[in-house]
């Protein structure tokens, strides 16, 4: 008999989790594709360090703001906005690459903007989960989210190499853009979510975890 994790028996969390599973794999695909892309653009090792800087600085700057907003505004709506923004940025990266207009500045700029979006998305996501499952299933829900993140970190790099070899660099970014639709569709399908404004339930600490699932 197949055991279904308790959190996945709740429809709205199930939608979100499967959407995140797809999206996180797409984000990891893009991350490793960017590393490879930079290697093809320059032989300077420091250029790779620039990606890390572009990913972490915006989160340090905006994480507390993102946490405060997640405590007061509609978290589902925040995620709809941030996920759409992340998809559009990935699409821009794909288009610039396909048109041959890509360079290090564009890569850093888009990476930084995606990190800004993640600084608002991550705390909203953490705060949304308690509205989707009862308190008794919260530990299981957060464990499943960690599993989704780690699965993406394993699957993403392998898929990225395969797509680059078979289709080209720009298609990795395009696939990532499409992967965000999985979360957007999940958020739409779950409908309105009742939530209480509970100041202090989301902290900057949750937002400062970008390298796990940064889109």
Give the predicted meaning of each segment:
Residues 1-215:
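Alpha-helical transmembrane-bundle signature of multi-pass membrane transport and export proteins
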